């Protein structure tokens, strides 16, 4: 089917400064990878109390040479502790233990003459974090078991605390999601599934495409996300969907700068289109499915904001496609913008 010209976007009314309002109560929460959001995995290790602190440096050097722990560089080898009498003491991490490990003596664990065990007490088993903590909550959980180094991602910490976006950014995000909600309502009026989506260029805050679910028995793949990606392509002189029967689906013609950028990005292969959504944001009322999530990977979207989760969602519920390390593109995902409104549009079955 030949691409159509679509319906040109008209700029919406500009609010007077006195009409600026605080965004409604919602949180844009990051949807992190399974490694970032999961519980701390623990493995067993052997440690021993340091009975003579004057031997600590030597013991640390000798034990580290025999058991360097290259896969666990986050683990600190010495843990402050207190003796039975309350005096300050320390424990030395010796080596990892198997899952069915039992009590072992110093002679069994530390080979002579590489390690002189003088100054060490009886070894004991202790759970330690298997991998470096990636978030502050993981760090707090990890260090409750054993001292652990932590290289904090300030952006993730701010996002988890709800402090990543300014009031002005939140207001713009709410406006874009409200536009997606309106598109979903227009879809419902046509007897279609009430899911709406908007693609925005964050560099200019310009709306590039507005769409809604157009799927039917004849066209089962026209989910809101797929429609929006095609509309962005139509704005760049590409695209393949005839959406003239859906007046709420519209796009903005690409500017010369956008067109040059779209035409200059490298192609997937000789017969494929350029990446049409490089650097863009998507707002969608419902969490995308696997098909739509993979389409966003191929389109090179930058960020996705969705209102309500979906039972078959692929950006947080069933899968986290956006964070898979084996894919050649990853993007940020946030959930919860106007969640109540979005959930009411298309209630869960």
Curated annotation (Swiss-Prot):
<dbReference type="GO" id="GO:0003824">
    <property type="term" value="F:catalytic activity"/>
</dbReference>
<dbReference type="InterPro" id="IPR002125">
    <property type="entry name" value="CMP_dCMP_dom"/>
</dbReference>
<keyword id="KW-0007">Acetylation</keyword>
<feature type="region of interest" description="Disordered">
    <location>
        <begin position="1"/>
        <end position="25"/>
    </location>
</feature>
<keyword id="KW-0819">tRNA processing</keyword>
<dbReference type="GO" id="GO:0046872">
    <property type="term" value="F:metal ion binding"/>
</dbReference>
<feature type="binding site">
    <location>
        <position position="223"/>
    </location>
    <ligand>
        <name>Zn(2+)</name>
    </ligand>
</feature>
<keyword id="KW-0862">Zinc</keyword>
<feature type="binding site">
    <location>
        <position position="292"/>
    </location>
    <ligand>
        <name>Zn(2+)</name>
    </ligand>
</feature>
<keyword id="KW-0479">Metal-binding</keyword>
<dbReference type="InterPro" id="IPR016193">
    <property type="entry name" value="Cytidine_deaminase-like"/>
</dbReference>
<dbReference type="GO" id="GO:0008033">
    <property type="term" value="P:tRNA processing"/>
</dbReference>
<dbReference type="Pfam" id="PF00383">
    <property type="entry name" value="dCMP_cyt_deam_1"/>
</dbReference>
<comment type="similarity">
    <text>Belongs to the cytidine and deoxycytidylate deaminase family. ADAT3 subfamily.</text>
</comment>
<protein>
    <recommendedName>
        <fullName>Probable inactive tRNA-specific adenosine deaminase-like protein 3</fullName>
    </recommendedName>
</protein>
<feature type="binding site">
    <location>
        <position position="289"/>
    </location>
    <ligand>
        <name>Zn(2+)</name>
    </ligand>
</feature>
<feature type="modified residue" description="N-acetylmethionine">
    <location>
        <position position="1"/>
    </location>
</feature>
<feature type="domain" description="CMP/dCMP-type deaminase">
    <location>
        <begin position="171"/>
        <end position="334"/>
    </location>
</feature>
